[in-house]
Amino acid sequence: MISIQGKGVSSGVGVGPLYFYHRTKTEIPRYTVTDPDAEWHRFKGAQTAAIEQLGELAEKARAEAGDEAAMLFETHQMMAEDLDYEEAISDHINNEKMNAEAAISDTAVQFAAMFESMDDSYMQARAADVRDVSDRILGILSGAVQGGIASDVPVLLAADDLAPSETGQLDKSTLLGFITAGGSGSSHKAIRARTMGIPAIVGVGDALKPEYEGRPCIIDGATGNVVIDPDDMTRDYLLKKREEQLRLQRLLETLKGQPNVTKDGKSIRIYCNIGSPDDVHAVQVNDGGGIGLFRSEFLYLNSPDYPTEDQQFEAYKKVLADMNGKEVIIRTLDIGADKQIGYFNLPKEDNPAMGMRALRICLTRPEIFKTQLRALYRASAFGKLGIMFPMVTSVWEVREAKKYCEEVKRDLKAEGIPFAEDVQVGIMIETPAAAIMSDRLAKEVDFFSCGTNDLTQYTLACDRQNNDLGRFYDPHNPAVLRLLKMVTENAHKNGIWVGICGELGADLTLTETFLAIGVDELSVSPRAVLPLRNAVRMTDTRESAPRLLAAIDAEFPETL
């Protein structure tokens, strides 16, 4: 029996033979060209063919699995014709006289490195997208045939890595789960596995040997454990665990439509975090009570230029209308120097996490901010909208932002354009400054939403993307929990509500703590709604609150 440890990114137990993904590798020729125009036309021809392929794949994915599955290929279409991407390839061909293949390859390396250097895990995962798009164009230039799964029976798939489009084309009927050498929980393969409801493990490194192919294997997506040639005891244990997981999933399905109320009658709202209008379907399927965080950056990241007011309005309107009266809280632009978008022309900064980003950009470039606010207020006529400002550190920033809101509303009224008068305005609490000033900030807004990812990072002075700091980056640290408790108390003293929209909101080991603190809303990924509802309904705060509130004041996080 061989046991390998990785990182589980999609829960479940998979049992079957191990199969290695066979990918056709394309050698990249490099030579100096004498006719750059001809080389550019070679690239453009392959680019056009790639865009057509991606369109066909998007339609196939939509027919088989809905809009959410199709979105990956549509995003790749936009990336393939991105002006910055094209310009970089053009520079290599025209200025350095590179052949098309070398120009595409070097551009992919350059863009992937840029994404990987960013602080945001979502943006880091985009490195795989640009590699994938480039590989598709290179494959067309070389005439290479894409690899795939050639097995006739369901298998556990093993690979060094899976490109986003490869993940998107996986057929659930032949896939029991997959294991990759690299990857993260925010990668496309992890998201796709969770969408398909199959177990997945990433980060096993070079532990999977070619000689393991075809041998019996069991994977546990919850623990990240891979067992090859399992003995009877291990096999029986994991099979029983799979049955228990299936039983729990059936139980969770019965919770749809049930209230989020503890045994002693304390209620809490459970909302969802989304990144595009296509995610609304997942919110509805998983019975989310609303949307607590709609990241509006997708409009800017997927556009070759600043999105217009009408483009933004249509996107916001669609989400509000689709949510059918349920609350939708949209976060204003959270672009920063660590999320470079070419047309923003942001300067390179040594410390982008503390540089020009989010609300700071909006307040220094009011034309961008006002365009977004106009689109938001126009969309408010079609549903229950809340507007949320990110990365706040002071009262004056909030007052300045609110001035622009009032200015936009006056303009819309003068133009006879309808909008809702009762739009709530809130802020994200994700800096220690905002937490410390929460008693004053609470007088300025209608709600707080705590972004625990950045709040933990800034409070502990610890880069959450640095794996070497894993033991020091602890969201359970009493310093973080005390700040959340203080923010909640200050919010309630001033008659406003408070929520949590970071990853910590879905941490079931802290659900009782958040209920004890008095948090009013938890906003999580759609798939986390029902497990969180179950945890809430199993809690009795009369018993747990005194113990947990005392633990927050403890010296060591282990007491929690």
Give the role of each language-model region.
Residues 249-560:
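Conserved alpha/beta-domain cores
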Residues 1-322, 328-335, 365, 372-373, ...:
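Non-catalytic, soluble scaffold/interaction modules
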